[in-house]
């Protein structure tokens, strides 16, 4: 093995199998590009992104870890989101949750 080399099993790797997903239409009404990373709590994404926020609470982009989606000014697109797993607690970002996703508005 070479240092830093990644060896994966043969065949396709499916991400987020069996997780709840959601499709959302998003538009960038800002004057600058907005980039959202793979594990960013989409509910708390930049306010220049216009979409129905309430249903996205507890969801992130359904894309490979370490990647992002960029929304250019004036651009609209539909993205696939996937529910957070594990403890389902969210801290940081814009500070809109700061704890458990369930049982809080």
Swiss-Prot record:
Subcellular localization: Cytoplasm
GO molecular function: urease activity
Entry EC no(s): 3.5.1.5
Gene Ontology biological process terms in this record: urea catabolic process
Record field: catalytic activity: urea + 2 H2O + H(+) = hydrogencarbonate + 2 NH4(+)
HAMAP family with a match to the protein in the record: Urease_beta
Protein's name according to its UniProt entry: Urease subunit beta
Organism: Pseudomonas entomophila (strain L48)
């Amino acid at each position: 093995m070479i240092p830093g080399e990644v060896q994966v099993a043969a065949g396709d790797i499916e991400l987020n199998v069996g997780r709840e997903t959601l499709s959302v239409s998003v538009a960038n009404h800002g004057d600058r590009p907005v980039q959202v990373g793979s594990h960013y709590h989409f509910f708390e994404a930049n306010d220049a992104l216009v979409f129905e926020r309430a249903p996205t609470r507890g969801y992130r982009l359904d894309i490979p870890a370490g990647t992002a989606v960029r929304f250019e000014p004036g651009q609209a697109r539909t993205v696939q989101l996937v529910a957070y797993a594990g403890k389902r607690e969210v801290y940081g970002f814009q500070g809109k949750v700061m704890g458990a996703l369930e049982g809080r508005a």
